[in-house]
Amino acid sequence: MTQHDRQQFKNSLIQSTKYFKIKLENEPIFNWNDTAVGSKAITSEGKTVWLRIQCGNCDDIKNNHTWSGEIDASSLENILKSNLIDYYNWQDKDVCWRALLLSYIDENFCSTHPILTDSKFLLSVKWLDELKKNLVVLSKYKTNRISITQEDVDKKIKKTFNIQVDTTITNWVTIHGDLHLANLTYPSLYILDWEVWGNGPLGYDPALLLAFSADNFDVVDKIREVFKDWLLTREGKIVQLFALAEVLNIAKFDSQFSRLEKPIEQMSKKIMNELVEKN
């Protein structure tokens, strides 16, 4: 993202404060890949809120479910997440903008990046148990939104690993679809950033969290233990392989993730050997 792009995001934040009648409380905070910006703010009644700005090409977003993800997620109940208060849309030439006013979560992010930025960070089993409870609740929601398809699973595994095994998934549920440590808070759990949620394979969320944490063996072991009924079945291993393939492809082309490449390759090889043995 260029400085000009960042300035446009900042200008949009200021523009949105006038619409919502709020006052920014801190400098704008960009997400890890610079696709959105947010800031803590105060309403005229003195309530603390979070203002988030996102944008996209107007033609591209017409059939892109990520554009409506946060708004659609406002229907989800009994899940620890931020709540949508209001939103505001506008268009500037061929770019569509959206400002989302969300409830403020007064917790720390587990990490400022999908991979751990603090080598001493430890997740507790209690926290992971709470995460699982929330994912179970989410899994039971009915939605027309699609996060991952069978075709996605088949193509990604075949292209990345060229393994000849049946990759059919039969257990499809509603998932978050982008579960990593930059979208989770600690010590109290909240699940953030709901752009891509929808139908997907059971176990994908913890599998993706595991893949992004591949170089932290303590975190990996705890995720596998808490989610063993989802991850250690045959289908669970297929889902793990798919998530590992996704992150491995990122690691090969983005230096920010390069340290994950070796541990993911080791994990993937072990899972492939297990799948071939049982095939």
Write out the residue ranges for each language-model feature.
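Hydrophobic, aromatic-enriched interface-forming segments
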Residues: K126-S188
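Active-site Asp-x-Gly
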Residues: T174, T185-D229
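A conserved alpha-helical element in kinase catalytic cores
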Residues: R6-Y19, W50-R98, S119-D129, K133
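A conserved long alpha-helix in the C-terminal portion of kinase-like catalytic domains
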Residues: L210-N279
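Conserved kinase catalytic-core helix
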Residues: G69-K81, L101-T149, G177, K270-E274
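Short Lys/Arg-enriched alpha/beta "domain-start" segment
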Residues: M1-N33
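A glycine-centered beta->alpha junction motif in the catalytic cores
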Residues: G56-N57, W90-S124, K140-N144, L241-S258
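Active-site beta-strand-loop-beta-strand hairpin of nuclease catalytic cores
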Residues: I42-V49, T185-Y190
